[in-house]
Amino acid sequence: MTLYQKAKQLLQSEYEKNFEIVKDSFYHKSFMNEKIRHSLQVAGAGNGILRNETYFKSKSSEFIEIAKTAILLHDIFRFNEIRIKYQDNKKVDHGVEGAKYLSELTDFNNLLITLPVKHHGHMIDVFYEDEAYFSIKDEELKDQIKHILFAARDADKIANWQILTKEYENMRLVWLPHPEDRTEKQGQITNKVWNSFLEGEVVLKSYIQTNADCLVSVLAWVFDINYRYSIDYSMRLNHLDGFEKILQDLKVEQSKIDTILNIVKDYISKRFY
C-alpha cells in the first residue's frame, strides 16, 4: 500500500468515527460531510498544482507522493475539531492538532507533511516564525516544506472558492457568521475589513462582523495565492463571477462590488501575468 493510499484510509477512518458521534446534529453532521468532500477536492486541486507548476515537475515521484499526502491530510483533525465543538463547545486549532496527531504516526511523521498541515490555515508569518521551521539547518528541506505548504494553501483556497460560489445556498449555514439574517445590515462591509482589502491584505478573522465581511475576507485570500496555476484554475471556474453574485445577494452596494472586483483583477494581472 502506498503512502497516499494509507492517507486516504486514515482520512476516511477519522471521518467515520467522528461522524458517528455528531450524526444527530444537523449542523455538525452537515459541516463534517462538507469537510470530507472538501478534503478530496483540495487533493484534486493540489494534484493539478503538482502536475503543472515548474518547481514540482523536477521532483522525484517519492517527493510528489509525500506532497500529495500532505495536501490530502491538511484537514485531518477537522473531524475531531467538529466533534469537540459538538461535545464540549470548545475550539481547537485543527492545523496544530493535526500536525501533532500525524507526528505520532510512523508513516506520516515527516516535516514535509506535518509542517504544511500545521500551517495551512495560519497567516503565513506564523509559519516563518515557527521554530520548528526556521531552526532547520538543511536549506533544501526548508524550501521543500515551503513549496508543499504553498501548494496546500492554494489548493485549500481553490476548493473553498469552488464550493462556496457553486453551492452558495447550501453552504450559507457553515460559512456565514449570520446565515439566517438576510437584512441589509449583513451587506455592510465594516471599516477594518474594507481598509484591509484596499491595502491588498488578508483579512484577520477578528475583524469579521457581518456576512459581507466574511465574503470579502474569503475573496481577499487571492492576496495569499502563490502559484499561477492556482489563479488560472480559479479563473477557468469563474469564481469571480460567483463572488459577484453572492455579494449582490448579500445586498452589498454595487459600487463597492465593482471596486472589489477591479482590485482583484488588477492584482491578478500585475502579480501573475
Task: Describe each model-derived feature in a short phrase.
Residues M1-H28, K35-Q41:
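Conserved N-terminal diphosphate/IPP-binding helix and adjacent helical/loop segment
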Residues L105-D107:
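Long, charge-dense
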Residues E62-R83, Q87-K90, H94, G98, ...:
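His-Asp-centered metal-binding catalytic motifs of divalent-metal-dependent phosphohydrolases/nucleases
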Residues K35, I64, N109-N110:
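Short coil/turn linker motifs that delimit alpha-helical repeat modules in TPR/alpha-solenoid proteins
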Residues F26-Y27, K118-H119, A132:
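Short linear capping/connector segments at secondary-structure termini
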Residues N110-I113, I124-Y128, W161-Q162:
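Short, structured loop/turn "capping" segments at alpha-beta junctions
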Residues T2, S30-I36, L40-S61, L73, ...:
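Divalent metal-dependent phosphate-bond-processing catalytic cores, especially two-metal-ion Mg2+/Mn2+ enzymes
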